[in-house]
C-alpha cells in the first residue's frame, strides 16, 4: 500500500518507490508535518518533534500550563491564521462579525483508489485507478465549523505526490476566503537552496538559485496569468546539489492564473514552504453549503540530483496530464506566417509560404493574427471573429482546402480573451471589457481584456469559434494571450464578487 495509516488513525505515511511523506495528528488535532524525503519504510518519526519554551510564542487553550506547546513553533501541514502562529498562513478567513481567524483541527482520514479530480481545473488523471491512491484528511475549523479537506494523490512508481485542498461552509453565515493555498508544509532540520525560474518577454525560465534564510523568499504573479516573468514551479535542494547528486524537492503548480510561492526559515530554523493562488486582491464569498477548491500542486523528490527530478516530472506530465492523440504521437512540424508577413497578407501569400514550406518537409501551415475583422494592425479588430474576405478571398474553408491539397495540415490563430476598442464587438458591448467605472483603463498592445466570468461573453465566443472550426478543416489552434490583466472589475458582479 502506498498510503499507511496507524491503528489509531492519526499517523499517516505516504510511500513512493524512493520517497516517504509523514504526518501526525497530535492529541489536540493539530496536523503536524514530520518528514518528506528518502524512503523510511514503516518508521514512526514523531519523536523528531522537540518542543521547548520559546519566548513570545503563545500557547493555545489545549496546552494548559505547558508553554512548550505553541502553534508558532510546531511544524504544521496546514498553517492557521490569527490564532498564534505568526508565520505565513495558508488559509485566511474573514467572518461576518469582522474577525479574521482560522484554526483547523483533525477529524478523520480515509484512503480511496485512483486519482482525485478538481472541478474546472487540471489535475493528474488515472484512467484505470491502478496507478494511484488518494489520502483525504478531514479537518474542522474550531469556531465556524467550516470543513477543510486536504487531498494527497500518490503516484508510487512515478515518485510523485500531489496536493490540493477544498473548503466547505458548513454553517449558516457566509465565510470570506482571503487566502487559500494549495500546499503548505514545515520542513525540519534542513539547510536548503531555493531554485526559481524568472524571465521576461522573449527570455523566459532563467534559473535563479538562492539560499533559504530567515528573510522570506517569495515570488509569483498578480497578472492574471502565471506568465513568463515567474514560472509557477520551484525546487528546494541541498546546498551542494547538482544534476546527479543531492536531495531535491520539486513543487509545480498546475494553474495558469495569479500565483504565489514562498520559502522561509522560522526562529527554530524550520523551513515553511507554500504554493497556491496569489491572495493579492483575492476575496471569495463562500455561502452556506458551498465548496471552494484550490489548484493542484505536484510534488516530487529525488535523492539523485536535478536530472532524476526532471525525468520524474517529464514522465508524470506526459502520461497523466497530457491528453488526446498527440500524447504518444509525434506532433507535426509547422510554419507560421507571422514573422514573414505580420498583418500584410492575402491568400496568395499564405499559399506561397505553404508551398515552399511543404517542399522542405514542413507538415502544417498556421495562419496567424490578421485574418478577421478590420485587423490591419494591432489597434483594431480583436473580438470581431468574422473572416476578412478582402484578405482571404473565398474564406477560410477554401484556403484550408488549398493547404490540404499540398499535403499539409492547417492551423489558425485566436486570442479569445481580448477585445479592441476599435471593434464592432466593443461598440456593441463596451461593458464586456474589464474596466473600472470612472477610470481610463490601462492598455497593452492597444487592447483590453474580456470579462470571461460573464456567460454572455462565453456564449458569444463559443458560437463564433464553433462556426469557424465547424465549417473549416482545422487541425491546430494557436491560442494566444498578449497582455496581462489589470483594472479588475465586473459590470455584472458587484461588491465582494468583483475584483
Annotate each predicted stretch with a short phrase.
Residues 18, 165, 289, 335, ...:
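Conserved, mostly hydrophobic/aromatic
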Residues 369-499:
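Aromatic- and carboxylate-enriched substrate-binding clefts and catalytic-loop regions
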Residues 5, 10-17, 21, 31-264, ...:
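Polysaccharide-binding surfaces and accessory modules of carbohydrate-active proteins
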Residues 180, 256, 298, 335-340, ...:
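Active-site beta-loop-alpha junctions enriched in small/polar residues
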Residues 291, 332-336, 363-364, 407-411, ...:
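Structural preference for beta-strand elements that scaffold enzyme active sites
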Residues 101-106, 284-303:
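Short Pro-Gly-centered flexible turn/kink motifs
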Residues 349-372, 471:
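Catalytic domains of carbohydrate-active enzymes, especially glycoside hydrolases
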Amino acid at each position: 500500500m502506498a498510503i499507511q495509516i496507524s491503528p489509531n488513525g492519526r499517523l499517516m505515511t505516504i510511500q513512493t518507490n524512493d520517497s516517504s511523506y509523514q504526518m501526525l495528528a497530535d492529541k489536540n488535532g493539530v496536523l503536524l508535518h514530520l518528514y518528506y524525503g528518502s524512503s523510511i519504510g514503516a518508521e514512526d518519526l514523531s519523536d523528531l518533534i522537540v518542543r521547548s519554551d520559546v519566548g513570545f510564542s503563545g500557547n493555545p487553550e489545549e496546552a494548559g500550563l505547558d508553554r512548550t506547546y505553541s502553534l508558532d513553533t510546531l511544524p504544521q501541514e496546514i498553517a492557521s491564521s490569527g490564532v498564534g502562529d505568526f508565520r505565513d498562513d495558508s488559509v485566511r478567513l474573514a467572518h461576518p462579525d469582522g474577525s479574521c481567524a482560522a484554526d483547523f483541527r483533525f477529524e478523520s482520514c480515509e484512503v480511496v483508489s485512483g486519482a482525485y479530480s478538481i472541478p474546472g481545473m487540471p489535475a493528474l488523471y488515472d484512467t484505470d485507478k491502478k496507478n494511484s491512491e488518494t489520502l483525504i484528511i478531514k479537518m474542522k475549523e474550531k469556531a465556524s465549523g467550516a470543513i477543510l479537506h486536504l487531498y494527497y494523490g500518490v503516484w508510487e512508481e512515478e515518485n510523485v505526490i500531489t496536493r490540493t485542498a477544498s473548503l466547505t461552509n458548513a454553517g449558516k453565515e457566509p465565510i470570506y476566503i482571503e487566502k487559500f493555498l494549495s500546499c503548505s508544509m514545515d520542513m525540519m532540520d534542513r539547510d536548503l537552496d531555493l531554485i526559481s525560474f524568472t524571465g521576461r518577454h522573449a527570455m523566459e525560465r532563467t534559473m535563479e538559485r538562492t539560499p533559504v534564510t530567515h528573510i522570506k523568499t517569495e515570488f509569483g504573479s498578480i497578472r492574471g496569468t502565471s506568465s513568463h516573468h515567474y514560472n509557477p514551479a520551484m525546487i528546494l535542494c541541498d546546498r551542494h546539489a547538482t544534476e546527479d547528486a543531492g536531495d531535491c524537492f520539486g513543487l509545480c503548480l498546475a494553474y495558469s492564473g495569479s500565483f504565489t510561492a514562498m520559502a522561509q526559515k522560522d526562529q527554530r530554523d524550520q523551513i515553511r514552504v507554500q504554493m497556491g493562488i496569489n491572495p493579492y486582491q483575492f476575496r471569495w464569498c463562500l455561502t452556506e453549503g458551498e465548496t471552494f477548491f484550490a489548484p493542484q500542486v505536484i510534488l516530487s523528490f529525488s535523492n539523485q540530483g536535478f536530472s532524476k527530478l526532471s525525468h520524474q516530472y517529464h514522465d508524470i506530465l506526459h502520461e497523466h496530464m497530457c491528453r488526446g492523440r498527440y500524447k504518444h504521437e509525434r506532433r507535426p512540424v509547422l510554419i507560421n506566417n507571422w514573422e514573414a508577413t505580420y498583418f500584410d497578407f492575402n491568400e496568395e501569400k499564405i499559399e506561397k509560404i505553404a508551398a515552399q514550406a511543404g517542399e522542405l518537409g514542413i507538415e502544417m501551415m498556421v495562419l496567424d493574427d490578421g485574418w478577421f475583422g478590420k485587423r490591419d494592425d494591432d489597434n483594431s479588430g480583436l473580438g470581431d471573429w468574422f473572416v476578412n474576405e478582402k484578405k482571404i478571398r473565398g474564406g477560410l474553408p477554401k484556403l484550408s482546402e488549398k493547404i490540404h491539397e499540398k499535403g499539409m495540415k492547417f492551423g489558425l490563430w485566436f486570442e479569445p480573451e481580448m477585445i479592441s476598442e476599435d471593434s464592432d464587438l466593443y461598440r456593441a458591448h463596451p461593458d464586456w471589457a474589464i474596466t473600472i467605472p470612472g477610470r481610463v483603463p490601462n492598455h497593452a498592445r492597444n487592447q483590453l481584456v474580456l470579462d470571461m466570468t460573464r456567460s454572455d461573453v462565453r456564449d458569444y465566443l463559443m458560437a463564433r469559434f464553433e462556426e469557424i472550426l465547424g465549417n473549416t478543416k482545422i487541425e491546430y489552434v494557436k491560442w494566444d494571450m498578449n497582455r496581462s490583466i489589470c483594472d479588475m472589475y465586473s459590470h455584472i458582479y458587484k461588491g465582494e464578487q468583483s475584483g
